[in-house]
Amino acid sequence: MSSRSYKRVLLKLSGEALMGEDAFGINRSTIVRMTDEIAEVAALGVELAIVIGGGNIFRGVAPGAQGMDRATADYMGMMATIMNALALQDALKHKGVDTRVQSALNIDQVVEPYIRPKALRYLEEGKVVIFAAGTGNPFFTTDTAAALRGAEIGAEIVLKATKVDGIYSADPNKDPTATRYARISFDEAIVRRLEVMDATAFALCRDQKLPIKVFSINKSGALKRAVSGEDEGTLVHV
């Protein structure tokens, strides 16, 4: 049985990850598989918080938002993350995982507002906490929300779940000689111009000395291995 390497982690899930093989929306088999992985990690005693994106439903920078006021489009994207958070909470509930959703936008009939002390208490009680609506402000990505919430709750690491199994020297889909980094420093990533997160999120993690691990959400058991400190994905460190 794997042991946990981290006590408290922040998991960043993209909305696109929920689509599976579908063109948009939430793929049921995909979200069930994800909740299996999350439940397995929660069972280790890891205090787990999640920031989820909304790109499977709407993105403020997507072609569909062209001609729209950027702030309005971003608020629509934030509401999409709330829909995803509720879907994830429901799926986790069916796995017996006690989960709370906190939103940076107030929709009192549906979700709790984000209140840091309450979020910390939930984590200490062993509940999974899903942070929705990004930072609550337009012009900021959910990557930035993940960095911000990770710093606020005192997470030991941000786990960024993507479609690739780490950070590569080049695009592995275009360059067969591309190699995966097992570890790389923040400064090295900047020098090599590797896109780990958007610049604001990356700078916040670096300034707060909050490491990032990039791994594939599509690999079975990858989340548990990442939490257990095994050689999974790429670790970005100070």
Curated annotation (Swiss-Prot):
Reported regulation of activity: Inhibited by UTP.
SUPFAM superfamilies, per the entry:
Carbamate kinase-like
According to its UniProt entry, the function of this protein is described as: Catalyzes the reversible phosphorylation of UMP to UDP.
- Location in the cell: Cytoplasm
The biological processes this protein is annotated with in GO are: 'de novo' CTP biosynthetic process; UDP biosynthetic process
Question: What are the UniProt keywords, alphabetically?
Answer: ATP-binding, Cytoplasm, Kinase, Nucleotide-binding, Pyrimidine biosynthesis, Transferase
Q: What is the protein name stated in its UniProt record? A: Uridylate kinase
Question: Which gene name belongs to this protein?
Answer: pyrH
Under catalytic activity, the entry for this protein gives: UMP + ATP = UDP + ADP
- Organism, by scientific name, is Bordetella bronchiseptica (strain ATCC BAA-588 / NCTC 13252 / RB50) (Alcaligenes bronchisepticus)
Gene3D superfamilies found in the cross-reference section: Acetylglutamate kinase-like
Indicate which residues the UniProt annotation says bind ATP: 12-15, 55, 59, 162, 168, 171
Which family does this protein fall into? Answer: Belongs to the UMP kinase family.
One Pfam annotation reads AA_kinase
What domain of life is recorded for the organism? Bacteria
Sequence positions that bind UMP: 54, 74, 135-142
Q: How does it assemble?
A: Homohexamer.
